[in-house]
Amino acid sequence: MKIAVLLSGGVDSSYSAYNLKEQGHELVGIYLKLHASEKKHDLYIKNAQKACEFLGIPLEVLDFQKDFKSVVYDAFISAYEEGQTPNPCALCNPLMKFGLALDHALKLGCEKIATGHYARIEENDKVSYIREALDKTKDQSYFLYALEHEVIAKLVFPLGDLLKKDIKPLALNAMPFLGTLETYKESQEICFVEKSYIDTLKKHVEVEKEGVVKNLQGKIIGTHKGYMQYTIGKRKGFNIKGALEPHFVVRIDAKKNELVVGKKEDLATHFLKAKNKSLMKDFKSGEYFIKARYRSMPTKAFVSLKDEMIEVELKEPFYGVAKGQALVVYKDDIVLGGGVIV
C-alpha cells in the first residue's frame, strides 16, 4: 500500500515511518511548514531528510503557513479576546494534517496518511472510529474528536499499540542516527507557543489591561492584570482585598474586562453544553464517558444531542469547565465525537 507519512523531524514520526517500511509499504515522507521560524524549519527538514535517506523514501515539503495562520492561529487569538480557552490542536488536526495534507497525499496516489499520534483506529460496522492509545498517559484521541469517519478510514497510527517509554530505545536500535539529531525544546501543550500563551498574545493584542475582580454577588473585591491572562479555575495573579482563603476564577467577562471569583466548590458544574462538531445525527442519548479537558479523567455522564447542541448531565461534578475547550464523548475507549464548549 502507498502511504504518506507526516514527518516532524523527531523520533516518533521517524519510527512510525520505519515500522510501515518494515511492513512492506511504499512510503512518501511529507514535512509540513505550519509555523515557527525558518531556522527551525531548516533543522527539522534536515532531520526528516536523514530519516527518508535511511529508509530510501522521497520527502516533500509543504508550506501551509498562510492557511495555518488564517484557520488556526488567528482563531486562537480571537478566542482569547472573547474570554475563551481555545484548543488549537483540535482545530489543526482536521483542517491541516488530515485536511490539506491528506488531500495532497491522495493526489500523490497514496491510499492512507500516517503520523506519530498516540491513538488507534477501530472499525465497527464498516465505520472507522478513533480509539484511545494503549499508553493512556500519552493518548491524543481527545485532539482527534472532530475528524469525519471517512477521513479516519484513511489514517494510520503506528505508535498506537506501543508504550512511549519503549519507543525511544526501539527507535534508536532501528535507526541509530536518531540519537544524534538536534532539536528545539517545544511547548508541551501548544506547538506554536514558545514560552507562554500570554507572550504569544502580546504580539497581537493588548494583554496588560487592568480590570476589576468581583465576587459572585457582584461586589468589587480586587483587581487583575488583564482578563486574557486568566483561565477558568486559575487561583493566582489577581489581588483580593483581605483574602483569607483561596479564590478561583469562575467566570470571565471579556467585554467588561472583569473576572468573577469564588471558592473551589463554585467551579463545580453538573451540566455542560457544546456546539456539535462530529457526533453523528443518529447519536442515541444515553450514558457515556466524557472529557472536557485534555488532562482530565473520563467522567460518566448522560449525553444527548439536541438541535446541534450536545447536552451533558454529569454523574459527579466537573470542576473548572472553560468555554472554547473540546467536549469529547467516549463509549468505553472509542471516540464517538464531540464539540466546543459554550
UniProtKB/Swiss-Prot annotation:
GO MF entries: ATP binding; tRNA binding; tRNA-uridine 2-sulfurtransferase activity
Xref: CDD domains: MnmA_TRMU-like
Disulfide bonds: 92-191
Entry keywords, A to Z: ATP-binding, Cytoplasm, Disulfide bond, Nucleotide-binding, RNA-binding, Transferase, tRNA processing, tRNA-binding
Classification via InterPro entries: MnmA-like, MnmA-like_C, MnmA-like_central, MnmA-like_central_sf, Rossmann-like_a/b/a_fold
Site (described: Interaction with tRNA): 117, 325
EC numbers, comma separated: 2.8.1.13
Active site: 92 (nucleophile), 191 (cysteine persulfide intermediate)
Catalytic activity as recorded in UniProt: S-sulfanyl-L-cysteinyl-[protein] + uridine(34) in tRNA + AH2 + ATP = 2-thiouridine(34) in tRNA + L-cysteinyl-[protein] + A + AMP + diphosphate + H(+)
Chief location bin: cytoplasm
GO cellular component, one term: cytoplasm
An annotated GO BP: tRNA wobble position uridine thiolation
Binding-site positions, ATP: 6-13, 32, 116
Function field: Catalyzes the 2-thiolation of uridine at the wobble position (U34) of tRNA, leading to the formation of s(2)U34.
Entry-linked HAMAP family: tRNA_thiouridyl_MnmA (MF_00144)
Family affiliation: Belongs to the MnmA/TRMU family.
Stated name of the protein: tRNA-specific 2-thiouridylase MnmA
Taxonomic lineage from the root: Bacteria, Pseudomonadati, Campylobacterota, Epsilonproteobacteria, Campylobacterales
